[in-house]
């Protein structure tokens, strides 16, 4: 298996939850960081022992040092960044949402089909205790097939509607 050489863009609080997970995965051999705020990128490099800092997204996706990108920016940038990374030949992992415009979603799908690159939208809400509780509960109710429409919790402790 080819090792992942991953560049993280958007070094904010949410990204901080993912860098250590990727960093410690045996399939990952190289971690770079990128943020529009230089100080934040430098802090991430030091804190997570990143191999390199890129100061612009364009510089990062143009680099041969990485083969994949993890997008943790503002959600209105997810689609355009994923498209640019895929066009640059990079695999993409993105925080939700995939994009805000249907056209961007369709373009991501088109590029993935054409290139064979991997795109993964990192939906993590399905692992919340409240979501797990609802799925388990649905399996025990009258042996019927149930579909969860909404699961809302506060601090992942109380289930209000399932």
Question: Which functions belong to the PLM regions below?
Answer:
Residues 52-111:
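Beta-loop-alpha module in the N-terminal Rossmann-like domain of NAD(P)-dependent dehydrogenases
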Residues 32, 52, 67-68, 118, ...:
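Short, Asp-centered acidic motifs that coordinate Mg2+ and/or phosphate
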Residues 43-50, 111-115:
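Short, conserved SAM-binding/catalytic segment
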């Amino acid at each position: 298996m080819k090792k992942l050489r991953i560049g993280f863009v958007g070094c904010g609080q949410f990204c901080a939850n993912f860098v250590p997970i990727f960093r410690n995965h045996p399939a990952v051999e190289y971690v770079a960081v990128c943020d529009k705020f230089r100080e934040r990128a430098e802090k991430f490099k030091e804190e997570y022992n990143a191999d390199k800092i890129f100061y612009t997204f364009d510089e990062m996706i143009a680099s041969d040092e990485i083969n994949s990108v993890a997008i943790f920016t503002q959600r209105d940038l997810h689609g355009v960044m994923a498209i640019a990374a895929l066009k640059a030949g990079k695999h993409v992992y993105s925080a939700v949402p995939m994009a805000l415009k249907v056209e961007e979603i369709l373009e991501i799908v088109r590029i993935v089909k054409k290139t064979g690159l991997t795109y993964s939208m990192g939906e993590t809400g399905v692992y919340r205790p409240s979501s797990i509780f609802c799925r388990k509960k649905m399996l025990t109710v009258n042996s019927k097939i149930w579909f969860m429409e909404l699961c809302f919790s506060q601090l992942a402790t109380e289930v209000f509607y399932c």
